[in-house]
Amino acid sequence: MSHQKILILDFGSQVSQLIARRVREQHVYCELHPYDVSEAFIRDFKPQGIILSGGPNSVYEAVDWRAPQVVFELGVPVLGICYGMQTMAEQLGGKVESSAKREFGYAELRARGHSKLFQGIEDRTNAEGHGLLDVWMSHGDKVTELPAGFKVIGSNESCPVAAMADEERGFYGVQFHPEVTHTIKGKEMLARFVHEICGCGNDWNMPDYISEAVEKIRAQVGDEEVILGLSGGVDSSVAAALIHRAIGDQLTCVFVDNGLLRLNEGAQVMETFNRSLGVKVIHVDATEQFMGHLKGVSDPEQKRKIIGREFVEVFQAEAAKLPKARWLAQGTIYPDVIESAGAKTGKAHAIKSHHNVGGLPETLNLKLLEPLRDLFKDEVRELGVALGLPHDMVYRHPFPGPGLGVRILGEVKKEFADLLRRADAIFIDELRAADWYDKTSQAFAVFLPVKSVGVMGDGRTYEYVVALRAVQTQDFMTAHWAELPHSLLGKVSNRIINEVRGINRVVYDISGKPPATIEWE
């Protein structure tokens, strides 16, 4: 099936991925590519419309950072955002200059000219009945002369050309960022652009994607066998379910229990995949191997390297027992592809395969199968539900690759891991029971390698401490600590201290990101 597509050209904005996510939310397929792709690529892509992203440069300084001229010659609508609007203006004969007043943050915009982009979209009206929009600005330059054929469709006191349009050609520019949630009606503006201005339908949906992906996997793999490292995380789980839907028993999954998983995670993975879905899963208990190599190691980076190295060793050993395997499957998703493509310039450049299991494809001499590489995380979750995976598995919070290895501060010991996984399970159980789990973006317990004095019954105790961490965030770049009810925290603390022998104190982390990170290590 051939989809109607939007092409997004990336000029290095911090939020370019958000543009793509917002377009996909409209059930319209899009791809994000560096701004300097070739004319041939753009023509072959056959876009219904093109979006030019923001970026950190000034058009009068960065003379090489231009949209290919073919963008304005294809006869399709174009939307320029921030820098994208400025390069559109400059390339089409307008003028851009440094602004005496820079704008960073919320701004109020007056819509003008009854443009198709803003028609009927407003946050409120002023006394004269003019539509007003609350938008998010981030710019130090401004358009001072419009290109021929353009009119002003939005302005404010500090930015007289805050939005512009040549409606005859379908060219629009906005100085603000409609892709961020701070622009209240940004979603409606992007929907208006892709559906009404570009004429895209709603032909990007999961049922169709499953059918297409299954056909593609079958054509790619043929009758050869595939091996996949199953972690129990969302991406590898959905990849396994999709590949199994396509090729059945040609897929073998290897699930490595390194002793650093969540409570009962191994049993849950085997129950879901092996018994419920009928996927072939090899369950390897490598706890002793991992713990042996982690003994005496306290540095977090060293722990990460050891856990990664040992996973590769275990996986290689199991792969060697499957000589017919010709493909290595991975749960690479679209943000991985974009991030691994990032060049020093900050733009998504030279996109290549993202090996999220370090070194395995080269070492094993296997071909790489990445069936999720076109999907964002929210789309992966939607796909997982459509494939029949349990909702709790698909919508569980992120879990670090090294597992509890980086949630046990300092040296990792089996005793510490056992205490931590039980405390963590209590925290998660109570969050679910209180209907707080889905209100937090990530929640977990951390084991602190210190002891504190306590009193239990008539006796003095000297036992370990755990910290609880829960955050709320939209993008994980910044995060606010979750303001959980004190009664809930009290219940969690009481259960942990009473049910997990060896812990006598529970603390709650109220640090935001920044200055703290979400994980402790």
Curated annotation (Swiss-Prot):
Keyword Nucleotide-binding among record annotations: yes
CDD domains for this protein: GATase1_GMP_Synthase (cd01742), GMP_synthase_C (cd01997)
Annotated GMPS ATP-PPase domain residues: 204-396
The keyword ATP-binding is annotated on this UniProt entry: yes
EC numbers for this chain: 6.3.5.2
Substrates-to-products reaction catalysed: XMP + L-glutamine + ATP + H2O = GMP + L-glutamate + AMP + diphosphate + 2 H(+)
Coiled coil region boundaries: none
Pathway(s): Purine metabolism; GMP biosynthesis; GMP from XMP (L-Gln route): step 1/1
Domain of life of the organism encoding this protein: Bacteria
Domain Glutamine amidotransferase type-1 per the UniProt entry, residue ranges: 5-203
Binding site for ATP: S231, G232, G233, V234, D235, S236, S237
Keywords: ATP-binding, Glutamine amidotransferase, GMP biosynthesis, Ligase, Nucleotide-binding, Purine biosynthesis
Pfam families per UniProt: GATase (PF00117), GMP_synt_C (PF00958), NAD_synthase (PF02540)
Gene Ontology cellular component list: cytosol
GO molecular function: ATP binding; GMP synthase activity
InterPro entries in alphabetical order: Class_I_gatase-like, GATASE, GMP_synth_C, GMP_synth_GATase, GMP_synthase, GMPS_ATP_PPase_dom, NAD/GMP_synthase, Rossmann-like_a/b/a_fold
Active site: C82, H177, E179
NCBIfam families: guaA_Cterm, guaA_Nterm, PRK00074.1
Main function: Catalyzes the synthesis of GMP from XMP.
Assembly and interaction partners: Homodimer.
HAMAP family, per database record: GMP_synthase
Name of protein: GMP synthase [glutamine-hydrolyzing]
Designated gene of the protein: guaA
